[in-house]
From Swiss-Prot:
Belongs to the pneumovirinae M protein family. One of its GO terms (biological process) is virion assembly. This is Matrix protein. Changing residue 47 to L: In strain: ATCC 51908. Forms dimers. Forms higher-order oligomers. Interacts with glycoprotein G (via N-terminus). Interacts with protein M2-1; this interaction directs the matrix protein localization to cytoplasmic inclusions comprising viral proteins L, N, P, and M2-1 and mediates the matrix protein association with the nucleocapsid. Interacts with host KPNB1; this interaction mediates nuclear import of the matrix protein early during infection. One of its GO terms (cellular component) is host cell cytoplasm. Its main location: virion. Pfam families: Matrix_Pneumo_C, Matrix_Pneumo_N. The gene is M. Plays a crucial role in virus assembly into filaments and budding. Early in infection, localizes in the nucleus where it may inhibit host cell transcription. Later in infection, traffics to the cytoplasm through the action of host CRM1 to associate with inclusion bodies, the site of viral transcription and replication. During virus assembly and budding, acts as a bridge between the nucleocapsid and the lipid bilayer. Residues 110-183 are annotated as: Nuclear targeting and binding to host importin KPNB1. It is a peripheral membrane protein.
């Protein structure tokens, strides 16, 4: 079994982002990715990861208004995992590598192949794209972060465009948009890191919360869902070998 610990926060209390790679225990097993709803923990990461791999996982495919889903049940006798959600539902479209192999409405035990734990900042220091978009009244433009990574094994570079948030820009300020992108955002981001969670997510640390980032607390972490963007790459390979080198910004008008 493989285990990975990504420490993006060193505090005594942190938010745990846990992802399992599992395989069904049956004659025609399906491979699944399971991510646990984030939870707060004060247990050391090294101790927590040891308990995370000693759980029993049951999976059942169900139908929901949001599409095919998986009902997950995690059983553990460890008090260390008392804060971790034990029953939850995730998207089958993101989770399943081979959905045709998973039976409908049958509870199946799974074997853990890999477990990843990422330590993030506490809940009130985390922000998502959804959080910011909901706070924008009559949005006119979108802010796109062009995050550049270098593969340290091959020296090749890749740029991942990520939607950050929508903003409202008045007509009189349109001419200054280019200046905003080069000055206001210049020092906003100190680093970006790809971690395994719900597939893959990008964690951006924001240092300057002026202007377009005014709803984000300084030094908070901004979580961007990459979904299946890198589904053909090994999660372990990407998280280990991709180094963030730069971030540029683009401000685009919202298209009808």
């Amino acid at each position: 079994m493989e285990t990975y610990v990504n420490k993006l926060h060193e505090g005594s209390i942190y938010t745990a982002a846990v992802q399992y790679n599992v395989i069904e225990k049956d004659d025609d097993p399906a491979s699944l990715t399971i991510w646990v709803p984030m939870f707060q923990s004060s247990i050391s990461a090294d101790m927590l990861i040891k308990e995370l791999i000693n759980v029993n996982i049951l999976v059942r495919q169900i139908s929901t208004p949001k599409g095919p889903s998986l009902k997950i049940m995690i059983n553990s006798r460890s008090a260390v995992l008392a804060q971790m959600p034990s029953k939850f539902t995730i998207s089958a479209n993101v989770s399943l590598d081979e959905r045709s192999k998973l039976a409908y409405d049958i509870t199946t035990p799974c074997e853990i192949k890999a477990c990843s734990l990422t330590c993030l900042k506490v809940k009130n220091m985390l922000t998502t794209v959804k959080d910011l978009t909901m706070k924008t009244f009559n949005p006119t433009h979108e802010i796109i972060a062009l995050c550049e990574f270098e593969n340290i094994m091959t020296s090749k570079r890749v740029v991942i465009p990520t939607f950050l948030r929508s903003i409202n820009v008045k007509a009189k300020d349109l001419d200054s948009l280019e200046n905003i992108a080069t000055t206001e955002f210049k020092n906003a981001i100190t680093n970006a890191k790809i971690i395994p969670y719900a597939g893959l997510v990008l964690v951006i640390t924001v240092t300057d919360n002026k202007g377009a980032f005014k709803y984000i607390k300084p030094q908070s972490q901004f979580i961007v869902d990459l979904g299946a963007y890198l589904e053909k790459e090994s999660i372990y390979y990407v998280t280990t070998n991709w180094k963030h080198t730069a971030t540029k910004f683009s401000i685009k008008p919202i298209e009808d």
